Amino acid sequence: MLSTTEQIAFILLVAVCGVLAFQGFRRIYIIVSQGKPSYRTDNFTLKLIKALIDVGLQKTVFKSRPIVSIFHAFIFFGFSFYLLVNINDLLEAYIEGWTTIGSSNAAALGFNLFSDLFSILVLVGIIYFLIRRFVGKPKVFEFNSNVKLQDKVAQGGIRKDSLLVGIFIILHVGSRWLGTAFHLAEREAAEWSMPTASLIAPLFFGWGGLEAGIHVTWWLAMGLIVIFLPYFPYSKHIHIFLAPLNLAFASPKANGELMEPSDSLNPGASNLDDLPWKNIFDSYVCIMCTRCHEVCPAHESGTPLSPSALEINKRYFINQNSSDLAGGKLKLDLLHEAISSDAVWSCTTCMACVEVCPVG
């Protein structure tokens, strides 16, 4: 249990970071709302349920890159379970005597076992992705040299975001796992329901810093989540929450179906707010995995088109100018900031990018 001072400090931290995060999400709503009307809410409840099931089973992720998708599933299922873990850790911090460690209750034993195993799976998954991005450096992450990119993207912005989130996950999950080992060491006992934490717990038997270690690891695990909240609306990892919504907003029409002829004297879109709101929302949901340009025949043949770069450029420009865009003081010129005219005319409208996209 946290001290009274720590409890108050945590509540204040949640309040401050919560307000900052709310402002970020509010800007997203305002900017997306500036788009043209697009009726995507018919049968929305049923479509959202289907989207949640598809996401829960990782069906959209496993459409390609099966090995990568397995490691993604480690993180997804682990983090999904960690919602319960974080709730439990909050209860431990604020309710005297609350703990699942040492309990003989079947639910507590099952919770401890899954917490322990999922901690390892998440750590294995995130280490795999960090090695893949920073050591393996697969060619699929590269853009053709003639593809238009926002300056921050060209300077490695995606890699920096991936590194920051990777470090956050390792510290969050690793600290929680280590804190469990400290709790076991405090009791000088191993438990079968926490096999991996029990392996390292004996290393800390009799250590005088266990109480401090338990508090430090709690703050690293839980405090980092709260501190990360204001950054979340600007990170590509916001897709965790937005992907199911985007899948539910997907058009019921078949991919590749011809659009109705337009009577507009200015068809198409020159600025961000000329796009339907769904196309603005897409830029927030994009995970920047580049699966789309991996299957794009135009990109693979060396043209300046990258479906991934289009969404990434939109997102980076929005992130850097969100206040002005939300306030109506600035417009995003798509041909200047997001895509070149040559890239537009390189598109074959084959819809391969849409078919492979794991987030709709």
Predicted regions and their residues:
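Membrane-embedded alpha-helical bundles of multi-pass integral membrane proteins
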Residues: M1-S270, L275-W277
